[in-house]
Amino acid sequence: MPILLFLIDTSASMNQRTDLGTSYLDIAKGAVELFLKLRARDPASRGDRYMLVTYDEPPYCIKAGWKENHATFMNELKNLQASGLTTLGQALRSSFDLLNLNRLISGIDNYGQGRNPFFLEPSILITITDGNKLTSTASVQEELHLPLNSPLPGSELTKEPFRWDQRLFALVLRLPGVASTEPEQLGSVPSDESAITQMCEVTGGRSYCVRTQRMLNQCLESLVQKVQSGVVINFEKTGPDPLPVGEDTLMELCRPSNLFAAQPWHSCHKLIYVRPNSKTGVPVGHWPIPESFWPEQNLPSLPPRTSHPVVRFSCVDCEPMVIDKLPFDKYELEPSPLTQYILERKSPHTCWQVFVTSSSKYNELGYPFGYLKASTTLTCVNLFVMPYNYPVLLPLLDDLFKVHKLKPNLKWRQAFDSYLKTLPPYYLITKLESDQILASVGKKPPQEIGIKVKNHSACGLPLAHNKSFRKLLKEIIGESAPRLTELNPKEFAGFQVGLLNKDLKPQTYRNAYDIPRRGLLDQLTRMRSNLLQTRKFIVGQDEDSLHSVPVAQMGNYQEYLKMLASPLRELDPDQPKRLHTFGNPFKQDKKGMMIDEADEFVVGPQNKVKRPGEPNSPMSSKRRRSMSLLLRRAQTAPTVTNHVGGKGPLSASWFPSCPSLVKHTFGHPDTTVIHDTHEEKMENGQSPPDGFLLKSAPAEFMNVSGESFISSQLDSLSDDFTGLRKDGFIHKPGNNILLGGAKTCSLSVADQKITMASALETVPNSMQITPAMAQGINADIKHQLMKEVRKFGRKYERIFILLEEVQGPLETKKQFVEFTIKEAARFKRRVLIQYLEKVLEKIDSHHLLNNVNHINSRSSC
């Protein structure tokens, strides 16, 4: 739970005006409110705690501390007045004391037992000042001095007043009082040159020199990004520089270098990110960073330690060591010259060991407790915290598990005892817990052995023996046994439960004079508890006070959010989140509108039912943009009355791929439909077959490119119709596929009628499709087409298969294609529209060809 403490300068110099007429104090108040709004965008801001401190004398400088809520914070912020001195040192000391008030009790600092990065209370101090001279009641100060005396117990254990999880950022207002005519400089905001800058850098923060309102907004956005969970560590190099890595190693060695020049990456003062656990929301760790002294029992007191530990790294390349089942901690380093140098070496399989000086009893530098290593993708540098002196411990544990099988010999025990002598005492608790976990892997937990108490009760004795024993005891000593009598439920046969008194009425007491005298005190207590609303049970409805909140308190969402339960985690984190489509089921992400296929970027299921009240008639397209190129219709050829597909029987085909269509239309038992015909071609971006061909269509009806035969190639198929008779279709041996359909277009009208009639006679009555059945099939196909068009991706095979199954004349099939084009235009399926327009053109050309052949056949007769 981050703590955000705002330290506002309330000195008299904050009353100066800017070129906009507002005072510095007004700008500071507005900056705090804007920061809260920017921070509220992050869902993690629900656990933020806000504090407000001014430059007044303590303890009056604390306006909102640990006990005040968000409403008090906002009220105190609005009521601030600038009328004091610029006592920055005292205000900073009061702010740090306020943050450290509960640290000794909570045990976060863990003095003398190592520094645990996962025990932290991340705090951000944001001070807003004008950067003028520091003043006090005595004189004007040139430098910033923090008082060393602190009333908090345990403050003497740390040399500095701040801790390693507390950072200071300063917004120094330098806004001019007269509008500047010079153009505003773009880029990053520079640091200020006031005395507070050094204090910010010591804590791991920085200062901002604000000269315009735009720079102030830029600084606030940067500060929102700085709210991270982590601790600040000093990284310093020890030993020689590393050898260069790469092909130019020899050239680098021959090149002269200044050995005494300090590089920026030799010493870095940066943050390491301590990420909270995704399940619990609290950071979890195992190993501490060692102390810079060896704790002993004869020490009179613990030596004070620095706020930021000094971690030294050796530039000798080592192999990263990790064994199974041994936990380790991993922390990411903030970008710095050190991380940049390690990443530029491009060696993710080597590491640099880290040490803490004087952490060991026998070695001044100490033993390694972890290492720095670049990530495998070379995007960041991580600090791995391992057990102390892990190069010795890990091989021992590896032998214990793999060689000795958890049964160590004498040699292993001696080596382990010598390792324990180099281990600081505070590591033993952590290591024993870890070893206990490792030893319990694959074993059942031991049963807890409790104290067995003998039961002296005579409940197990028979009832007759128990009665005779008590009777004998009474005769001997003259009294009953000095213990509780054991009740037998069978002895109370006439026991009855008291019934509810029906004459007793509920005591509502609407009139105070109806309360009897003996119940006045009891009723007064109940009335008081009801008035003060001190009940703890669940209220079925909201209180009336929630609906009559003043306007000034309507924006106080913090207190309401604290009462809400934390949201549950996602059941499947890998599943993409569903797009919020309130009021519009077809709402899409804005980034999807910048490409041709907008449906590729839609998140969530797309199988949604069409909204009621939106008909499919051509009149519904008037609400769309008339200038859209997606709605242009294909040029239709002049139509001539088709006597075959008109009022006659249902045409079995409407495209040259008639065999598969006839087979599917009449529902032959041997028919199979396979939808994966052109799936690979569709995924590669190539065009699908122009005709509606199923995989079950014979190969002789398709050319090399996958397109259907056109009218010029129909003559070559005349041999297939030599066996056509007037009594029915041809049945080829070994293949139960009905042939015919569109190929009959070259015959006479009479032959066509006879052929269709005989075909219907050949097929059983249960398999004939009536007009009512065809209408129902088409309605179902229309509904499926609407669902297929809305689906994600570019797999259009199912759409073409559904269009193949449309029942009715050629004009009906043409209407279905036009309807599919309209649906595709609603979802901006440009590629699908192009395919459908090609199909529509082929339908028109085929329709025209049928009519020409029909006229030629009549003229020949």
Curated annotation (Swiss-Prot):
Residue(s) carrying Phosphoserine: S617
Coiled-coil zones: none
Ranges for domain VWFA: 3-227
A Pfam entry, by short name: VWA_2
UniProt xrefs under PROSITE patterns: VWFA
CDD domains: vWFA (cd00198)
UniProt keyword annotations, A-Z: Phosphoprotein
InterPro entries linked to this entry: INT_SG_DDX_CT_C (IPR029307), Integrator_subunit6 (IPR051113), VWF_A (IPR002035), vWFA_dom_sf (IPR036465)
Protein name as annotated: Integrator complex subunit 6-like
Phylogenetic placement of the source organism: Eukaryota, Metazoa, Chordata, Craniata, Vertebrata
